[in-house]
Amino acid sequence: MSKIDVAIIGASGYTGGELVRLLTRHPRVNISTVTSRKNNGEDLSSLHPNLQDLDLKFTNPDTKDIDADVVFSALPHGVSMKLVPEYLDNGARVIDLSGDFRFSDVSVYEKWYGMKHEHPDLKAVFGLPEINRDKIKDATLIANPGCFPTGAILSSLPIVENKLVDRIILDSKSGVSGAGISPNNNTHYPTCADNIKPYAIANHRHTPEIREQLRNFGTGTVKVSFTPHLVPVIRGIITTNHSFLLKNDVSASDVHDLYMDYYKNEPFVKVLKDNNIPLLASVRGSNYCQIGGISLDDEDELVVVSAIDNLVKGASGQAIQNMNIMFGFDETEGLKELGLYP
């Protein structure tokens, strides 16, 4: 069985470590390069203690010396955009996990990320397989979705595309690993333990990403409000999706059936059959998105709940899912592990 060579750029963070963890059990992959500028020469286990006994060290090669079929860029936004064109020039296909290439209109990126885009003409395919599978197959550059947008979009698509709602309010709660590996006051134990903290209210960078993708469906004018919260768990995002139905002859059971039918062929989206409420613990460590808790009150307010692991379906697992599609592998290859409940 032939293998492809994979390079992971910026592997010192949590998403980089997850890429290594998941790719080591992928039968079609050879990890050829794992980079970290600050940790050059060190064993991966110096930062990722779960990656013991791997014959891999952090390196810091020149971009031109990175020889790979596919490059995963786990660099921060603003940094990734500078190097992605060089990887493409080397002949690699690139999956970028930053926000640098997620927007069709570069002015939206510049407004929300507060920096000028250095390669505005370089366009990527938005890497959410559930909506862009055919485009992903032939893409040379994939913009891997953000963690919050993944759960938010998947919880919204059926009702938006079927024009059942025109406004959505998203309340998302994320584990602290979503804030990255570098410690700060928000993720300091005395600050985040026994606490829930809303943040970036009305101005989170993932808001326009959610809006752009949902407006490609339905009427194209759906309004989206998004508020994230930091909660004292390590992994996972649970999103509660609130909307008001435009039709009063639709029941919660009808909506549940709609979701079941919409996602029936999706390997990693599981609409809970008994409409149970998704749990973070059920998806931890997995590439699955669970959807359930679909409820309708007496004023036609609809609630839909989704749960993902922010580091897997929300980042590294989804990136590998995209790689599988790009190279014609089974889409689920290397990603079949179930959640780590309890």
Curated annotation (Swiss-Prot):
GO biological process per UniProt: L-arginine biosynthetic process
Location of this chain's protein in the cell: Cytoplasm
Main location: cytoplasm
GO cellular component: cytoplasm
Listed name of the protein: N-acetyl-gamma-glutamyl-phosphate reductase
EC number(s) stated in the UniProt entry for this protein: 1.2.1.38
Family: Belongs to the NAGSA dehydrogenase family. Type 1 subfamily.
HAMAP family: ArgC_type1
Organism of origin: Methanosphaera stadtmanae (strain ATCC 43021 / DSM 3091 / JCM 11832 / MCB-3)
Active site positions, chain numbering: 147
Catalysed conversion reaction: N-acetyl-L-glutamate 5-semialdehyde + phosphate + NADP(+) = N-acetyl-L-glutamyl 5-phosphate + NADPH + H(+)
Keywords annotated in UniProt: Amino-acid biosynthesis, Arginine biosynthesis, Cytoplasm, NADP, Oxidoreductase
Pathway terms, separated by semicolons: Amino-acid biosynthesis; L-arginine biosynthesis; N(2)-acetyl-L-ornithine from L-glutamate: step 3/4
Any one GO molecular-function label of the UniProt entry: N-acetyl-gamma-glutamyl-phosphate reductase activity
Source organism phylogeny: Archaea, Methanobacteriati, Methanobacteriota, Methanomada group, Methanobacteria
Function description: Catalyzes the NADPH-dependent reduction of N-acetyl-5-glutamyl phosphate to yield N-acetyl-L-glutamate 5-semialdehyde.
PANTHER family, per the entry: N-ACETYL-GAMMA-GLUTAMYL-PHOSPHATE REDUCTASE, CHLOROPLASTIC-RELATED (PTHR32338:SF10), N-ACETYL-GAMMA-GLUTAMYL-PHOSPHATE REDUCTASE, CHLOROPLASTIC-RELATED-RELATED (PTHR32338)
Record-linked SMART domains: Semialdhyde_dh
InterPro entries: AGPR_type-1, NAD(P)-bd_dom_sf, NAGSA_dehydrogenase, Semialdehyde_DH_NAD-bd
Cited CDD domains: AGPR_1_C, AGPR_1_N
